[in-house]
Regions:
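Conserved P-loop NTPase
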Residues: 1-15, 23-24, 133-136, 206-254
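Positively charged, low-complexity intrinsically disordered leader regions
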Residues: 20-29
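Pre-Walker A adenine-sensing motif
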Residues: 28-40
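Conserved P-loop
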Residues: 46-48, 52-117
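Loop/turn-to-beta-strand initiation segments
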Residues: 74-75, 107, 136-139, 171-179
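Conserved nucleotide-binding/hydrolysis micro-motifs of P-loop NTPases
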Residues: 82-86, 114-118, 146-147, 176, ...
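Phosphate-binding/switch loop-helix module in NTP-utilizing enzymes
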Residues: 113-171
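Conserved catalytic-core segment of NTP-binding enzymes
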Residues: 150-158, 162-171, 178-222
Length: 254
């Protein structure tokens, strides 16, 4: 059973300078996506990024952090239960993103929670909060929500702990992407409450179309933003994510 969540959050709550809350937008680093969501994510919000394996969730998260550090002056943290820091760096180099440089400059911190999770979820989250404080982060990618869920004995326990965590991130005005795995063959998230957990929901979907892989992005939920029912084709290029300019009408979506 996970305990001590309240104490962890309260002891770290005053560690961050607070910013004036407002409806200003945080660029994702994907211009075509930002156009769909009125300029970007609402600052301080938490967005769930859900998708099957291989749909580019990690790439989207890294692009979000690199763009923030390089173009927006916003430091970030990538906290992963699944990937090691070295693997993330290797993947990032494919897109020309040098995470080593950003780490040395104090603009990015990679946190591997693979071993920390063995000491308990509270310890792992304390590690994340310490990293956020160290680099004065304004952006966080947590990978993954699905892996975190397995550490709890019940959905109710997980729900309670995550609400505490999200309240802390909101108070710190940290804009967060939480990655969630969708198993192959399923159209819903891992648990019944994940899609209601965040302020926004981005769904990445992969399917086969005429013997080729077709990737689509949907944005069924985004707080303070006009909802779009269309799906958009997207590609993972040498420079990262890119959306096709023409939407897929709802009546054409299978």
């Amino acid at each position: 059973m996970v305990t001590g969540g309240n104490q962890v959050m309260e002891t770290r709550r005053t560690a961050f300078p607070t910013l004036q809350q407002g409806d200003d937008r945080v660029q994702t680093g994907i211009p075509s996506l930002d156009k769909l969501i009125e300029g970007g994510l609402v600052r301080g919000d938490t967005t769930i990024v859900a998708g099957q394996p291989g749909t580019g969730k990690t790439t989207l998260g890294l692009q979000f952090l690199v763009h923030g550090a390089v173009k927006c002056g916003e430091n970030g943290v990538y906290a992963s239960v699944i990937e090691s820091g070295e693997k993330l760096k290797r993947n990032a180099r494919r897109f020309g993103w040098d995470l080593d440089v950003l780490e040395k400059e104090g603009r990015l911190q990679l946190v591997s929670l693979q071993s920390t999770m063995k000491a308990g979820v509270s310890t792992a989250l304390e590690t994340v909060l310490e990293a956020l404080h160290t680099v004065k982060a304004r952006r966080l990618v947590f990978d993954s929500l699905s892996a975190l869920m397995t550490a709890f004995e019940s959905t109710a326990e997980a729900r309670s702990f995550l609400h505490i965590m999200l309240k802390f991130l909101e108070a710190a005005n940290c804009t967060t992407l939480m990655i969630s795995e969708v198993p192959w063959g399923k159209q819903q998230l891992g648990t019944s409450f994940e899609e209601f957990l965040g302020d926004g929901l981005i769904v990445l979907e992969s399917s086969f179309d005429n013997s080729r892989v077709r990737r689509r992005i949907y944005i069924p939920k985004m707080r303070g933003t006009e909802n779009r029912l269309e799906g958009y084709d997207y590609y993972i290029t040498r420079e990262g994510f890119a959306l096709a300019p023409t939407p897929i009408p709802p009546d054409k979506i299978r």
